[in-house]
C-alpha cells in the first residue's frame, strides 16, 4: 500500500534540492514549492524575478529565488549550453538566448549540481519541458526520464486530506 509518510521521511533524509522554472508564471507551482518547503521534503529553488515573486506571493522565506537575467552564473550557463550544443550547430547568440529561458536555466542548474531535480510541465508543454534535459544532461546507462504528479491536500471528490501520486505513462 502506498504510504506517503515513508516517501516524505526518505526525502527529508536525502535533503535534495528541487528547482521550479515555472514559478514566475504559475501560482500552482509556487504553492507546490511552498508545500514542499513547509513539509521539509526538499530545498526549493524558484527561477524568476525575485522582486516580482515576493510582491505577488507571500511567505517565500527559505526558498531560493534565482533570476536568470541577473544571476552571477548566467554567463557560465551560457558557456556550458554553447559547449554542449556547439557540435549541433548552436550559435553563441542562441546559447545566450537559451541561458535566459527559465526551463533551460533550471536544466543547467541540475546539470551543474546546484539542484538535484527539476519540476516542470505544469504550464509548459511536455516537449518544451523535456527538450532541454534531453539536449543538455548527459545520459547515464542507469538513468531514466520519469513523469509523475504528486497531489497534496484536500481533494474535492475524495473529501479528505490525501496525497495522490499519478504517473504519466506516456513517458517511458
Predicted regions and their residues:
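Anion-binding alpha/beta catalytic cores of soluble intermediary-metabolism enzymes, centered on
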Residues: 1-172
